[in-house]
Amino acid sequence: MKRVAFIIHRYGSEISGGAEFHCRALAEALQGSFEVTVLTTCATDHLSWKNVLDPGRTYLNGVCVMRFPSIQERDLEAFHEIYDQIFQTQLSAEREQELLRRQGPYCPDLIEYVRTHAADYDAFVVFTCIYYPALQVIPLVGGRVILVPTAHDEQSLYLHILDELIPRVRTIFFNSEEERQLVQKRFALASTFGEVVGVGLSAPQDVQPDPAWVETASRLKGTPLLTFVGRVE
């Protein structure tokens, strides 16, 4: 059975976040067809990267999860001191690296694990192209990386360090056609490079409708509705 490692900055059933949910859904769907291991941090908060969960190996819904500590919490003031400069000038390579460390999660033990165990895995599914773990892993195993960039048209996407790394991955899984166009244009990639994959959904089995909702739906029939889809954290 082929072995696949997922790289994600946070992971867990208690964590809300688009990339985090996507990673967990995909890892759980592939478990059984592949031997899946998730490499992540001990953080639950993406603002501070504070170590909350225990380091080491655990299992969640049958998926092996290996957690590594962040060795520094994020200093938002120091981070924005550098980040805000992106809007005014091109940062040097050294300042970009410093920005990535300050953005975090700064987890060199995770990177060292990939370096020393790279041969143990057939593929690496790497999430979110602007975080430290992703950008450190790609140079080590780029030819086996399936990148899920979860890219937005934001200033971080225009860091020069990305120009060297994104073209080195094996392929890219996009969440939408718009994201595909954004990334392909930004990095001058061939239109055939990467696929729009999105996030799979499993239909619930044997779910009985809530009688209260049936009554409400009947009462509101023909009434214009506004639906909000998002997350609360």
Which residues make up each language-model segment?
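N-terminal subdomain of nucleotide-sugar transferases
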Residues: 1-69, 119
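Conserved donor-binding/catalytic core segment of Leloir-type glycosyltransferases
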Residues: 5, 201, 213-233
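A conserved catalytic-core segment of Leloir-type glycosyltransferases
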Residues: 41-119
